[in-house]
Design a protein with these regions (language model features):
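Short, hydrophobic/aromatic alpha-helical segments in well-folded domains
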Residues: 1-4, 22, 107-111
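TerminUS-proximal long segments
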Residues: 116, 122-127, 148, 152-156
Length: 176
């Protein structure tokens, strides 16, 4: 935006460069995934989460994550779970231990589309839309059976629905 407005973006460009270099330090060879890293302990969380798939949304087009994505999506029906279903820590109802969040799914889907992974992006979109259409604007959903959980009227879930519904209507009318 700054460049469009003909503003000085040197400082922000420097921040972006540092972040782009730093993101690769979040790759955890042990689990073959991007992972959370605890700066205090100096250790990885050793867990694949929905945040692991935010690499594409962040402009890091890493094909190594595709096999993890495919493996996990083959185990669920209602969007990207917030935690790996194969993990002993997985709990499909517990906050950030398994439920699917529409807002995270939207960002992952956008990232996949930006990376040219259109079929995978559509899978995330269709599964998320299925959860919302069947169960309303819940805060999050069980990724296996779609049961709504948390708050029942979340605006970010409604915003995801409206954003993706707009795209669906545009596609049906031959418009983007």
């Amino acid at each position: 935006i700054g460049m469009v407005l003909d503003q000085d973006v040197n400082e922000i460009s420097g921040w972006i460069s540092i972040q782009e270099q730093g993101v690769h330090r979040l790759w955890n060879d042990k689990i073959s995934s991007y992972d959370s890293f605890d700066l205090n302990s100096g250790k990885f969380a050793d867990s694949i989460s929905s945040a692991s798939f935010m690499c594409w949304y962040g402009g890091v087009y890493d094909t190594r994550m595709l096999s993890q994505f495919d493996r996990i999506m083959n185990k669920v029906n209602y969007g990207v779970p917030s935690h790996d279903p194969d993990s002993v820590k997985f709990d499909r109802k517990r906050y950030w231990r398994g439920p699917s969040w529409a807002i995270m799914n939207m960002m992952i889907g956008i990232g996949l589309a930006d990376a040219g992974e259109f079929e995978r992006a559509e899978l995330v979109k269709s599964q998320t839309n299925l959860a919302i259409s069947q169960n309303g604007f819940a805060e999050y959903f069980d990724p296996i059976d779609g049961t709504p959980a948390g708050g029942t009227t979340f605006t970010w879930t409604a915003a995801v629905w409206l954003g993706w519904a707009k795209n669906l209507v545009g596609e049906q009318n031959g418009r983007d």
